[in-house]
């Protein structure tokens, strides 16, 4: 890859990206800029600065940024307006974080005069696709370096040996250890590898880091309310909150009640099936609540159309097409549908469950007068149903006469 002198690396401070940072310098002769994003992963990020400094990277080329509000406001909430779940289950916690990281990688490359960006995603997974599609959409001329697709460090042992040779500190719990891949942000935590690679084996409880076992959750339910305005959450139990603060508070409630665990075998974009364990405590509560407020504010046609669009929208995010015109077209339609999605949802949190038990809205389409089993005082003429049924039955009658 010619004409590259400086590269911006998506840097976590962990062993893999520390090796990559040094490898880019030693093997490729590049000047390295590191970028570490705080997306609410719950880790202290200043050690990443110290590790970068220890490798000789100057302070002006070390970027650590708090992106939590931008992440939830501009990525998570728009996705939640669509009720997006990949393959019906996965709330896309890893997928939705990649576009923002890629955006800042490209921007920092432009700010620092770098010729390329680099990431630590492997050649087997989805993240390489997500990072690179996003980067190319934002800067068609950017160059991307993906060391896992290039180098000969094909085993954990080889990686550790290379790290030790170049004076990179190796944590004791990494020595001789097979990869156990984790990802975390304010929306979720995911785990893959090791015992999870056998889809028949139940996920051991020690793998879960973000939620209590539902069996050990409180024996008494907890009731909460979430207020929505035009499809976005704005308050918890009547207290106004920013997007990131709202999700943080819901995460704690979900953790306490064991909500949001998902054991999933999914279809990766690159073609293989993989098994992952996901914890999305606050996101699961929020998604249930959003669905609840839509139930009384969305017209049937709009609601059903949204449900038809959702799988495609979720697939686009999963596959890395956040910055594509088709995702933006779908987003425009979804956002338009949210104009009247305002009100309050009450939920019951209990031993792994988040159940909607009440909803109200000034824009409600629910008419108790029409649905009551008591006297509706003429609100609905039941005899009208006869003609409705007759018209809808016409084609079925004609088919029946022909085929039966």
Curated annotation (Swiss-Prot):
What InterPro entries does this protein's entry cite?
Arginosuc_syn_C, Arginosuc_syn_N, Arginosuc_synth, Arginosuc_synth_CS, Arginosuc_synth_type_1_subfam, AS_cat/multimer_dom_body, Rossmann-like_a/b/a_fold
Under the heading Pfam families, the entry gives: Arginosuc_syn_C, Arginosuc_synth
Pathway the protein contributes to: Amino-acid biosynthesis; L-arginine biosynthesis; L-arginine from L-ornithine and carbamoyl phosphate: step 2/3
User: Recorded E.C. number(s)?
Assistant: 6.3.4.5
Q: Which GO terms describe its cellular component?
A: cytoplasm
- What Gene Ontology terms for biological process does this UniProt record contain? argininosuccinate metabolic process; L-arginine biosynthetic process; urea cycle
Please give the name of this protein. Answer: Argininosuccinate synthase
Organism field = Erythrobacter litoralis (strain HTCC2594)
């Amino acid at each position: 890859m010619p004409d590259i002198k400086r590269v911006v690396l998506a840097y976590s401070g962990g062993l893999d990206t520390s090796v990559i940072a040094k490898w880019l310098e030693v093997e490729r002769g590049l000047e390295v800029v590191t970028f570490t994003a705080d997306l609410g992963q719950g880790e202290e990020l200043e050690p990443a600065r110290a590790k970068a400094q220890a490798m000789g990277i100057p302070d002006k080329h070390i970027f650590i940024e708090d992106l939590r509000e931008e992440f939830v406001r501009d990525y998570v909430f728009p996705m939640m307006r669509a009720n997006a779940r990949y393959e019906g289950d996965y709330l896309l916690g890893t997928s939705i974080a990649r576009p923002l990281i890629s955006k800042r990688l490209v921007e920092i490359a432009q700010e620092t005069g770098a010729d390329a960006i680099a990431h630590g995603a492997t050649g087997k997974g989805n993240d390489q696709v997500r990072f690179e599609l996003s980067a190319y959409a934002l800067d068609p001329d950017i160059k991307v370096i993906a060391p896992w697709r290039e180098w000969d460090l094909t085993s954990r042992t080889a990686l550790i040996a290379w790290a030790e040779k170049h004076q990179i500190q190796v944590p004791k719990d990494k020595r001789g250890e097979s990869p156990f891949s984790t990802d975390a942000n304010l929306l979720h935590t995911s785990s893959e590898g090791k015992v999870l690679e056998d889809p028949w084996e139940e996920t051991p409880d020690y793998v879960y880091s973000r939620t209590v076992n539902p069996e050990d959750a409180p024996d008494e339910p907890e009731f909460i309310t979430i207020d929505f305005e035009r499809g976005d959450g704005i308050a918890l139990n009547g207290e106004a909150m920013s997007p990131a603060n709202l999700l943080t508070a819901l995460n704690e409630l979900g953790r306490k009640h064991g909500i949001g665990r998902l054991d999933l075998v999914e279809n990766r974009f690159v073609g293989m099936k993989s098994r992952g364990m996901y914890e999305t405590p606050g996101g699961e509560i929020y998604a249930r609540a959003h669905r609840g407020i839509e139930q009384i504010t969305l017209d049937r046609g709009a609601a059903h159309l949204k449900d038809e669009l959702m799988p495609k929208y979720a697939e686009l995010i999963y596959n890395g097409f956040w910055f594509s015109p088709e995702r933006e077209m779908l987003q425009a339609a979804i956002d338009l549908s949210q104009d009247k999605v305002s009100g309050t949802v009450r939920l019951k949190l209990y031993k792994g469950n988040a159940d909607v038990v009440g909803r109200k809205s000034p824009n409600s389409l629910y008419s108790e007068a029409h649905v009551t089993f008591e006297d509706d005082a003429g609100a609905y003429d039941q005899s009208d149903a006869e003609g409705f049924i007759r018209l809808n039955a016409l084609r079925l009658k004609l088919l029946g006469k022909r085929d039966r």
